[in-house]
Amino acid sequence: MIKSIILQAIMVLSTLTSVHGANSSGCGKQPTLVNGVHKINDREYILKVPDNYNANKPHHLIFGLHWRGGNMNSVVNGESVEPWYGLETRAQGSAILVAPNGRNAGWANTNGEDVALIDAIIKQVEDDLCIDQSSRFATGFSWGGGMSYALACARAKEFRAVSVLSGGVISGCEGGHDPIAYLGIHGISDPVLPFDGGVTLANKFAANNGCQQAYVGKPGLGSHSSVQTDFKGCSRPVSFIAYDGGHDAAPLGVGNPLAPDATWKFFMAA
């Protein structure tokens, strides 16, 4: 079983185009994939195609990864966060969004099975829909942040950027040596995945990207504010936002634009 998963992942990965690639094979086709739940083997994901979808226009591809105890519907419906982490509204029809379902309400990524799932979804979606293959992104909170970090490690050549909200090394880090645009957002009083660990994740990709070392600033306790640190001299951008809060799916409160605005701006500038 394990060998089968690994072999399937290698075969799918060999068909994926890097962030330096062109448009997907789905461009110009009449699509067959529709909004809603889709299956790959024994796994599921929810797909959201813009209402104004144009098969001749390449779209961004954005993965929204749920937290521990959540599921794909939590991301789509906006449980404790804006729907789709606030990115659907900011994309204004320019992105196709995917919310995969983790196994056992999480992303243990055992033997790389969750990375393999993402690979398979990319292939299925891009074979049918028009995607700019240089414009794939992933974001998630908590375990979803950990899974986004795992994708940064294992699929830096396939994704342009990730935004890790209150993440940790909880889905592994296969590879982890290639540069990728990396945004970390973390509460200074996080009791679940400590703030310093979030800084360590960002520092890893700052090193991969050849950035100058930087002091990561923090807001005052009780200030209800945030401090953004942009690393300098990087081959690919690295930023870290420290906010006054704990382990929060929506930093500074549901409806606060901090994380959605920062993530969208970072993705588009990456």
Swiss-Prot record:
Reaction equations catalysed: feruloyl-polysaccharide + H2O = ferulate + polysaccharide
EC number: 3.1.1.73
An MF annotation (GO) of this entry: feruloyl esterase activity
UniProt keyword Secreted present: yes
InterPro entries assigned to the protein according to its UniProt record, in alphabetical order: AB_hydrolase_fold (IPR029058), FaeB/C/D (IPR043595), PLipase/COase/thioEstase (IPR003140)
Keywords attached to this entry: Carbohydrate metabolism, Glycoprotein, Hydrolase, Polysaccharide degradation, Secreted, Serine esterase, Signal, Xylan degradation
Domain of life of the organism encoding this protein: Eukaryota
GO CC field: extracellular region
GO biological process: xylan catabolic process
Subcellular location: Secreted
Pfam families membership: Abhydrolase_2
Keyword Signal: yes
Transmembrane stretches, start-end: none
Glycan-carrying positions: N23
Family statement: Belongs to the faeC family.
Function: Involved in degradation of plant cell walls. Hydrolyzes the feruloyl-arabinose ester bond in arabinoxylans, and the feruloyl-galactose ester bond in pectin. Active against paranitrophenyl-acetate, methyl ferulate and wheat arabinoxylan.
Name of the protein in its database record: Probable feruloyl esterase C
Species annotation: Aspergillus flavus (strain ATCC 200026 / FGSC A1120 / IAM 13836 / NRRL 3357 / JCM 12722 / SRRC 167)
Lineage: Eukaryota, Fungi, Dikarya, Ascomycota, Pezizomycotina
Gene, per the UniProt record: faeC
